[in-house]
């Protein structure tokens, strides 16, 4: 990645002065931060897994009557 695309704070701007994207969509998948939808999907799956574990535990083991 060239350093001339970076702004004063080190981040890459979304658009160049002529309006074209600064970074192609292919490179956005491999460089920089993770997409928010991916983080939310993994986090949601983790929450559902923990809740499922609690429900499973309520029907088996200690406290299952």
Swiss-Prot record:
GO terms for cellular component: photosystem II reaction center; plasma membrane-derived thylakoid membrane. Residues 1-17 have a biased composition (Basic and acidic residues). Its main location: membrane. PSII is composed of 1 copy each of membrane proteins PsbA, PsbB, PsbC, PsbD, PsbE, PsbF, PsbH, PsbI, PsbJ, PsbK, PsbL, PsbM, PsbT, PsbX, PsbY, Psb30/Ycf12, peripheral proteins PsbO, CyanoQ (PsbQ), PsbU, PsbV and a large number of cofactors. It forms dimeric complexes. One of the components of the core complex of photosystem II (PSII). PSII is a light-driven water:plastoquinone oxidoreductase that uses light energy to abstract electrons from H(2)O, generating O(2) and a proton gradient subsequently used for ATP formation. It consists of a core antenna complex that captures photons, and an electron transfer chain that converts photonic excitation into a charge separation. NCBIfam families: PRK02565.1 (NF002722). This is Photosystem II reaction center protein J. The gene is psbJ.
């Amino acid at each position: 990645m060239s350093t001339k695309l970076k702004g004063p704070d080190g981040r890459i701007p979304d658009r160049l002065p002529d309006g074209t994207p600064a970074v192609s969509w292919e490179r956005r998948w491999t460089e920089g931060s993770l997409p928010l939808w991916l983080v939310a999907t993994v986090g949601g799956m983790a929450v559902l897994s923990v809740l499922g574990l609690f429900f499973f535990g309520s029907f088996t083991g200690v406290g299952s009557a």
